[in-house]
Amino acid sequence: PGLSCRFYQHKFPEVEDVVMVNVRSIAEMGAYVSLLEYNNIEGRILLSELSR
């Protein structure tokens, strides 16, 4: 059975929050990631954000 764990009350992080992620794939527009501290929900980091 898969365990589910959340570290924060909110379902999603706020803008400008720093979170731990696992990169799932890299595409032309950016990277698809799993947000480790938010029950592994999927997110996307745009390429323009990665280059900052």
From Swiss-Prot:
Phosphorylation at Ser-48 and Ser-51 stabilizes the eIF-2/GDP/eIF2B complex and prevents GDP/GTP exchange reaction, thus impairing the recycling of eIF-2 between successive rounds of initiation and leading to global inhibition of translation, while concomitantly initiating the preferential translation of integrated stress response (ISR)-specific mRNAs. Substrate for at least 4 kinases: EIF2AK1/HRI, EIF2AK2/PKR, EIF2AK3/PERK and EIF2AK4/GCN2. Phosphorylation on Ser-51 by the EIF2AK4/GCN2 protein kinase occurs in response to amino acid starvation and UV irradiation. This results in the global attenuation of 5' cap-dependent protein synthesis and concomitant translation of ISR-specific mRNAs that contain a short upstream open reading frame (uORF) in their 5' UTR, such as ATF4, ATF5, DDIT3/CHOP and PPP1R15A/GADD34. The keyword Mitochondrion applies. The modification Phosphoserine is found at residues 48, 51. It holds the Pfam family S1. GO terms for biological process: cellular response to amino acid starvation; cellular response to UV; HRI-mediated signaling; mitophagy; negative regulation of translational initiation in response to stress; PERK-mediated unfolded protein response; response to endoplasmic reticulum stress; translational initiation. GO terms for molecular function: GTP binding; ribosome binding; RNA binding; translation initiation factor activity. It is found in: Cytoplasm, Stress granule; Cytoplasm, Cytosol; Mitochondrion. SUPFAM superfamilies: Nucleic acid-binding proteins. Keywords: Cytoplasm, Initiation factor, Mitochondrion, Phosphoprotein, Protein biosynthesis, RNA-binding, Translation regulation. It comes from the Eukaryota. Residues 16-52 form the S1 motif domain. Belongs to the eIF-2-alpha family. This is Eukaryotic translation initiation factor 2 subunit 1. The lineage of its organism: Eukaryota, Metazoa, Chordata, Craniata, Vertebrata.
